[in-house]
Each structure stands twice: as structure tokens, then as C-alpha cells.
């Protein structure tokens, strides 16, 4: 969701309630983003890395945390303001997408130099500051989340006059688009210039 969604929803709810309805009614809108991955959603829900609850009402935030505490250790429950919670969701996806574009850009260099991107990935992945996740060269990222969330960051940066920041994140999408186009051309080249009437098998196709 775009940053400030919770704030907008709360304003809409407040403005739609008449004075008579407001009496004795109390509500709070919280931000509670999910960090589930396709294919591992159930396990991610049962064993989350963290639970993020953003809001400005401590009682409401604690009430929601009690639900999670029935199966999640309280050390994994994080409390932030709404802005931080909503931005953390966008940033998490942006960082994952950035890793994909980064290793794919290195893959292009490996191809022209004779290096093996798998060996490079394994070597840098041993660095504990970097880690090994999301370092497999691939056709790039797709789906409905990564690109959307990055462009949301781009819009946000441009809105606040941070053009260099916007350009940085937009480059992640540009690299991804360039890499996907490069891969498609490589496939056609390997199939002698055409895919017409050719049988192509895609292994591990997923979201």
C-alpha cells in the first residue's frame, strides 16, 4: 500500500461519521504489513522473521500484538509509527529487487569476461555483511509487488524533491527491464534466430 494509506483511511472514517455516531465510538487504524513470499506463505505466517505494527495509539497496538503473541515470540514484534511501518514494507521489497538487479548486472559482466556468476555469487555470499540470499542470477523479477513498490518509492522521492534518490531506485527497474530484454535476445540467438515452432521448457517457473 502507498505510504500514508492508514492516515487517509482514518481521516475518511472520521469524516464519514456524524456527531451522533461519534459518541461512545473509539477506533484506530494501524499499519500491519505482511512479509509473506509466494510458495512459503503458510510457513512465513507461522514462523515470521518479524511482526510489524505501526500506529499512534499504544493501547490499540498492544491489543493487536496480543493476537500475534499466541504463536509469535514478543521479541519478534516491532512497534513503530505509521509512516515507518508503511515505508518499511516498500523498502523491504525494494531492497530484495535491488539484490536481483545487482547480481544480474554482474552476470552480464561475467558473460563478457569469462567469469562464472555462480562462483562470484558464492564468493561474495560468504561475506556475512552481504549474505547469500537473492544472489542467484535469473531472468529478473516480475509479479505485482517489486516493481510497484519501487515505483512508489520513486514517486515519494520525487514528491519531496529527492530526484537523485528517485533516479537511484528507478535504475533498479531499468536494469531489470534491460536484463529481461537481454535474456530474451539471448534465447532467440541460441535457437538460431527464431523461436517459431521451437519447443521451450521453463524449469522452476514461479511468481
Give the location of each predicted region:
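Structural/interface elements that position substrates and couple domains in central-metabolism enzymes
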Residues: 1-207
Amino acid at each position: 500500500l502507498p505510504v500514508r494509506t492508514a492516515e487517509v483511511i482514518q481521516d475518511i472514517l472520521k469524516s464519514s461519521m456524524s456527531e451522533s455516531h461519534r459518541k461512545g465510538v473509539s477506533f484506530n487504524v494501524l499499519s500491519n504489513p505482511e512479509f509473506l513470499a509466494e510458495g512459503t506463505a503458510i510457513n512465513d505466517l507461522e514462523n515470521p522473521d518479524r511482526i510489524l505494527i505501526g500506529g499512534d495509539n499504544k493501547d490499540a497496538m498492544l491489543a493487536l500484538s496480543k493476537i500475534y503473541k499466541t504463536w509469535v515470540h514478543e521479541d519478534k514484534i516491532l512497534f513503530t509509527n505509521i509512516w515507518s511501518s508503511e515505508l518499511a514494507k516498500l523498502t523491504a521489497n525494494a531492497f530484495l529487487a535491488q539484490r536481483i538487479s545487482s547480481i544480474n548486472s554482474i552476470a552480464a559482466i561475467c558473460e563478457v569476461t569469462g567469469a562464472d556468476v555462480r562462483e562470484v555469487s558464492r564468493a561474495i555470499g560468504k561475506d556475512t555483511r552481504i549474505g547469500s540470499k537473492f544472489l542467484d542470477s535469473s531472468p529478473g523479477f516480475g509479479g505485482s509487488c517489486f516493481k510497484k513498490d519501487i515505483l512508489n518509492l520513486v514517486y515519494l522521492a520525487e514528491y519531496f524533491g529527492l530526484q537523485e534518490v528517485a533516479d537511484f531506485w528507478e535504475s533498479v527497474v531499468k536494469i531489470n527491464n534491460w536484463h529481461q530484454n537481454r535474456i530474451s535476445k539471448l534465447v532467440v540467438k541460441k535457437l538460431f534466430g527464431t523461436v517459431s515452432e521451437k519447443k521451450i521448457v521453463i524449469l522452476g517457473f514461479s511468481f
